[in-house]
């Protein structure tokens, strides 16, 4: 992988790929044929060209992931796609899985959390960068989850329980890392407790995720709501055809969320703004099939493949990687900023190292990126402390961006109780 590169990530619910044993939702080989799906998948992969490809509703047969590699990824002269062994503690007939470009990425670890109704899979990847041999490792954690379907109180509670287990694991192991959480979340709106847990209410602010669609108006009560037509991911078909859900595009069930490390590029990886897409959603197919008439988002062959392969659309995003080696570290001094104690009440005691006499600006942001207050003070060189008044701010989670007049900056998370 080059010192500066861009990774494309794709998450896709493959609709009972390679599994017919249960007849789930009337899905059989006759109406959800794996060989036919492979043709559609190859068309979609050739269009998106992902570097990381995560999936839900993948059959749990032991050899299926190798067959998938051979038929869809490592074809012709291509031989660099890899995957990992299946873990399936829940003994489900459909599982999550991952495929990745081994020229750019390696896998250090795969953990499956014992959640209900299916395992939550955590893949710890690392970038194969120029500095890797010297021990300079940049990690990217991909968490793939398929939450309980349905909109009853019991369904919502099961989704919440699964993500509470997951968030605790993130808090304990990956709270300062580059993390993506993706999958079919079956969420009906941003007011659902599970969505709020992931983005706002979990007790450890370092474990929270950011929804890439917040900044472009994609967060709200999206189900059966034409105002969110550009963001829906299900269903690809207007009319019921046994295995496939019907109704056209009117739900946002499929997600990739990112840790704030990825959102703001704290650790060599940074989300490319406005790169998040539901592949094939042109905003003009609300309650319609994705290939009805013309589709301005993708070529006709891709729209037809999306219609044929699954009742979900894949979602994608791009991540810029800057892992340059040999940089003079003195050009970017570490402010070593932290807030302690944290949570805070009326004031935040900010400790930091000032590399050079000058003005330092303190900007407080909401988790959604809204600037709430700005304070600027002059500081001498050396260790510093500053009492930042937060009396006008309600309880919640915030981001404090600290910027020196020379351009050196750092962002820390703050909890007001």
Label for each model-derived stretch:
Residues 4-324:
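Divalent cation-coordinating acidic motifs and surrounding scaffolds
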Residues 121, 382-388:
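Short strand-edge motifs at loop-to-beta-strand transitions and within beta-strands
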Residues 322-340, 355, 370-372:
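Residue-level detector of functionally pivotal "anchor" positions at catalytic/ligand-binding pockets or at interdomain
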Residues 379-381, 395-417:
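C-terminal tail/sorting-segment detector
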Residues 348-354:
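Aromatic/hydrophobic beta-strand junction motif of beta-rich domains
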Residues 358-361:
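Short beta-strand/loop motifs in extracellular/secreted proteins, especially
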Residues 364-372, 398:
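Short, glycine-anchored, charge-dense loop/turn motifs used at functional sites
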Residues 345, 356, 381, 394-395:
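Surface-exposed loops/turns
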